[in-house]
Swiss-Prot record:
It comes from Pneumocystis carinii. GTP binds at residues 11, 69, 138, 142-144, 204, 226. It is found in: Cytoplasm, Cytoskeleton. InterPro entries: Beta-tubulin_BS (IPR013838), Beta_tubulin (IPR002453), Tub_FtsZ_C (IPR008280), Tubulin (IPR000217), Tubulin/FtsZ-like_C (IPR037103), Tubulin/FtsZ_2-layer-sand-dom (IPR018316), Tubulin/FtsZ_GTPase_sf (IPR036525), Tubulin_C (IPR023123). Its main location: cytoplasm. This is Tubulin beta chain.
């Protein structure tokens, strides 16, 4: 079957990853040690997309856990799902990257990368038909950003024809974890533009907003944020893991979502967003799901789709949903909001259906949008980058690890190019219409 190899790097990547594995273990009826306790054959049918079957009826995640310091890995190992993972798949250094992209990409990370690739090869060789890789990491730190992008480029080199999907936590507008975040993020985007096939952008601030505004949680913690991310990750891969009427996989998703190779940065969303206790008090309908799914407030990245236009959209519905109803809803969204979709891609919404809902819900939908408004996010990081880079602030930490200023300049201009490409396609197609109007009047 179409296996996916999962990598999680750095503190953020490992925490999101741990949350993701607990979510999909539950969906497939596995307990915290990987023993199958489920009731339905459907849970077993495509278990091997993410799990290897081990002796004694245990299932082991095809997951590789990577960090440059042992702390986060110890936390995962001692957590509720610590016994799920294969012990050989924990690869960690001792020194840490100290939020320094250069350490993750060139010095500390480069020393560890070969032992990670050995584990990647071992996992890939055990697959029947490897579909691709997915990696969870953040772009603001040292390990997830620096070493994460190093791994992506190494895997790209070795498996050029396999899909590479990344779940990347991008820096937030107001909440900054580290001062050098803009540097790390810009250097990472520079890599992702070239080496990733699809990048799902997530940011903490948008997640906080959802937790507080929609879920009414008084003080959300990282556990709540990671829960939202894992819901989306589970939704995106649901068609691979369960039979459905309209199946999609990483490659089909990319073919439908990426009109130009560099523009593969997606905004994601999920519906229904209900707090843990309240979802039993309302019934869900497809129109409600669709409305919530397209609602700008529920996007998990801080860029407002109303400020741009959608190039393409994918909607993945789960549960007992009528195919016709979904098609009608999607059609009506495009009709009513046609100004928010580019007119030079006629049917730019792709739908997929899967008959098995997530745990505790009757139906759900996952939203993936390739919107030109994502440029806001890159623009914001770029402005912060150039403000610091103009003064060469903090640069010695990077040049001390052997980096050159030239690399910073290249990364900056690559990101500026990306922003202007998004701008160009946002207004493309409008110009021709203006000329047509003139002709009609004459």
């Amino acid at each position: 079957m179409r296996e996916i190899v999962h990598l999680q790097t750095g503190q953020c990547g490992n925490q999101i990853g741990a949350s993701f594995w607990s979510t999909i273990s539950g969906e497939h009826g596995l307990d915290s040690t990987g023993v199958y306790q489920g009731t339905s054959d459907l849970q077993l049918e495509r278990m091997n997309v993410y799990f290897n079957e081990a002796s004694g009826g245990k299932y082991v995640p095809r997951s590789i856990l990577i960090d440059l310091e042992p702390g986060t890995m110890d936390a995962v190992r001692s957590g509720p799902f610590g016994n799920l993972f294969r012990p050989d798949n924990f690869v960690f250094g001792q020194s840490g990257a100290g939020n320094n992209w250069a350490k993750g990409h060139y010095t500390e990370g480069a020393e560890l990368v070969d032992s990670v690739l050995d584990v990647v090869r071992r996992e890939a060789e055990a697959c029947d038909c490897l579909q691709g890789f997915q990696i969870t990491h953040s772009l603001g730190g040292g390990t997830g950003a620096g070493m994460g992008t190093l791994l992506i480029s190494k895997i790209r080199e070795e498996y050029p024809d396999r899909m590479m999907a990344t779940f990347s936590v991008v820096p937030s507008p107001k909440v900054s974890d580290t001062v050098v975040e803009p540097y790390n993020a810009t250097l990472s985007v520079h890599q992702l533009v070239e080496n990733s096939d699809e990048t799902f952008c997530i940011d903490n601030e948008a997640l906080y907003d959802i937790c507080m505004r929609t879920l009414k949680l008084p003080d959300p913690g990282y556990g709540d944020l990671n829960h939202l991310v894992s819901a989306v990750m589970s939704g995106i891969t649901t068609c691979l893991r369960f039979p459905g009427q309209l199946n999609s996989d990483l490659r089909k998703l990319a073919v439908n979502m990426v009109p130009f190779p560099r523009l593969h940065f997606f905004i994601v969303g999920f519906a229904p967003l209900t707090s843990k206790g309240s979802h039993s008090f309302r019934s869900l309908t497809v129109p409600e799901l669709t409305q919530q799914m397209f609602d700008a407030k529920n996007m998990m990245a801080a860029s407002d789709p109303r400020h741009g236009r959608y190039l393409t959209v994918a909607a993945i519905f789960r549960g007992r949903v009528s195919m016709k109803e979904v098609e009608d809803q999607m059609h009506s969204v495009q009709q009513k909001n046609s100004s928010y979709f580019v007119e030079w891609i006629p049917n730019n919404v792709q739908t997929a259906l899967c008959s098995i809902p997530p745990r505790g819900l009757k139906m759900s939908s996952t939203f993936i949008g390739n919107s030109t408004s994502i440029q806001e996010l890159f623009k914001r990081v770029g402005d912060q980058f150039s403000a610091m880079f103009r003064r060469k602030a903090f640069l010695h930490w990077y040049t001390g690890e052997g980096m050159d200023e030239m690399e910073f300049t290249e990364a900056e201009s690559n990101m500026n190019d990306l922003v202007s490409e998004y701008q160009q396609y946002e207004i493309a197609g409008v110009d021709e219409e203006v000329e047509l109007d003139d002709e009609i009047e004459t």
